[in-house]
Amino acid sequence: MSISWADSYVGQLRALAGDRTLMFVGARAVVRENAGRVLLIQRSDNGQWALPAGAMELGESIADCAVREVREETGLRALRVSAFALYTGPDRTHTNMYGHTYQIFTTAFRVEDWDGEVTRVTDETTDARFFHRDQFPAPLSASVPETLADLDVFEQTNRLILK
């Protein structure tokens, strides 16, 4: 079960900062099964299909954040993760549907080992399923194709992607 928005680090910071632009540090995770299908979640806030992702909380590492988000949004337990891309910079600034602006710093992780059964509906999701890349549903978050393309490059070069 996830913590409430008001109790989250970003929620508490937003309450103090008002409408000022905030830095948002988060993680995104790519979970694949043996046939190569990718796990996507359908977000309950905007209906988009996306990779499991979310904000880092005080007291956890960025890898812990990825593991926690996978658990909260899919029910799976990520046993081993490795970072493959960092997304930073002012071009990563986003205003959400509530009018709050964030400059986003995201670390993308490959989940190398996991166990459990997918929970299709959670506090943050309305669905979660594995899809072949050529059969992704709409509406699809713009971060999905970019992240998967970067994972492909990482797996060919073994070099961290910096954007």
Regions found by a protein language model. Give the residues of each.
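Acidic, metal-coordinating catalytic segment for phosphate/diphosphate chemistry
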Residues: 1-28
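Active-site-adjacent beta-strand/loop module that shapes the phosphate/pyrophosphate-binding cleft
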Residues: 87-117
